[in-house]
């Protein structure tokens, strides 16, 4: 069940995260507002909202920004109405790509996303064309300085599906329905997580190199740079040696 964070690892190496902090805030604020609208403004009774708030705190978002986003979602403040859509398609080399968006203008967004696919040697597909290649899972990441055996035992006892160590992290995998329960149970035992999210994990990966690898990274960058895009998932793999050539 490994490999879900390939793009995150690459972004970290490229040093791209800090440069896009403003866009990260915008995306999290959208998620908080939509979560509050759908499930109410109480994080204790709304797991999706609680997860979004935790992510905001992890990015050091000011408390006032979080509270305003919740109020916009619950109707306490005037705000934009967003629609959630998932676009699917193929990148270079036949890589499967899922794009989650929140938009107030469906026509504008689909035009932007389709343009990015086309310019990066990919193409958009019909709904359902690649979604079956991914599994929705909770992923909780920890520093490798923690005792793996202790974390492994505690995680399985709390209801986790699997625990693996890779890319200088220990990752605990859960079903989406037990994600919050497992995360909180481990935190109560002193295991502080670095990140925690519900994400889409590819069942298989497509190895890329050369021009295809460059085009795929360009596609990921441009999609994430799109204001309406919340998350991008793709089942590509680029070796460390290949990354060194492109850096």
Curated annotation (Swiss-Prot):
Cystine pairs annotated here are: none
GO CC list: cytosol
* UniProt-annotated location(s): Cytoplasm
Q: What is its main location?
A: cytoplasm
Give the UniProt keywords, A-Z: Cytoplasm, DNA-binding, Transcription, Transcription regulation
Q: Which GO terms describe its biological process?
A: regulation of DNA-templated transcription
InterPro entries (UniProt xref)? Integrase-like_N, TACO1_YebC-like_2nd/3rd_dom, TACO1_YebC_N, Transcrip_reg_TACO1-like, Transcrip_reg_TACO1-like_dom3, YebC-like
Query: Where is the secretion signal located?
Result: none
User: Which superkingdom does the taxonomy of this entry point to?
Assistant: Bacteria
MF annotations from Gene Ontology: DNA binding
What family does the entry list? Belongs to the TACO1 family.
Full protein name: Probable transcriptional regulatory protein Glov_1245
Provenance organism = Trichlorobacter lovleyi (strain ATCC BAA-1151 / DSM 17278 / SZ)
